[in-house]
Amino acid sequence: MAQKDSESTLDVQWRLDTLNTNKIFAGCFNFFRKWKVKKNQITLIEKLNTGGTGSLFEIKNECEKRGLPFHFNIITHADYEVSPRNLGGLLKLFTIKAFRMATSSHIFLNDNFLPLGYMKLSDETKVVQLWHGMGSFKKFGGSFETDRAVLKELSAATKNTNHILASSENIRDNYAEAFMAPKEKVICIGCPQVDYFFRKHDIDAWKRELSENTHK
């Protein structure tokens, strides 16, 4: 009996592995595009797991701090896990979250999101790539990838991206190459997560906490 259960699980995993989840998710998104875009709906796509930190969540936290009436639809790395244990998560991703994304006025990314290349976005929807790594310390994306199929998907995804934020004018060319994008799409205004360093912090409290923990 245990062997049959194991074989059944492996069969499900094989079927999941053969699915093109990029195209499936995009297909669901395109179906839900029939509905009207909501100006107060924003989608955050955390394809790279940051544990709820970084530029994506700086935007969310700041909007909530200001009391702005936005509804946030969050798609995490875990939602996109293709495995038998996440069948419920995939179902929710392809239905509820795809619907909310399709009706969002703004979509923010922290990594490449290849389903974007297959999506038919509304003219009312703006897509902004925040990228998780500030600066340009290594080659990535179009500067590094050699798989032609992946490069094709990346190029298509970039065509559906309105803006790519960079931390400095000095890396505009690097970002344009990495995202296979025209330089005009790269906006060098800094990254939201840098705002943390411009806030007032209680340094004395941190020193006391550090001192207490050091002497325990």
Where are the predicted features?
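Short beta-alpha junction loops
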Residues: 76-81, 113, 133-134, 169-170
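Extended catalytic core of nucleotide-activated donor transferases of GT-like folds
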Residues: 57, 84-153
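Tryptophan-centric aromatic hotspots in well-structured domains and transmembrane helices
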Residues: 52, 72-74, 127-131, 179-183
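A general structural motif
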Residues: 38-39, 69, 104, 124, ...
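N-terminal pre-catalytic "stem/leader" segment of glycosyltransferase-like enzymes
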Residues: 2-99, 106, 115
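Hydrophobic/aromatic beta-strand patches that form the interior of the parallel beta-sheet core
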Residues: 73, 108, 126-129, 163-165, ...
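A nucleotide-sugar donor-handling region in carbohydrate enzymes
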Residues: 7-28, 138, 143, 153-216
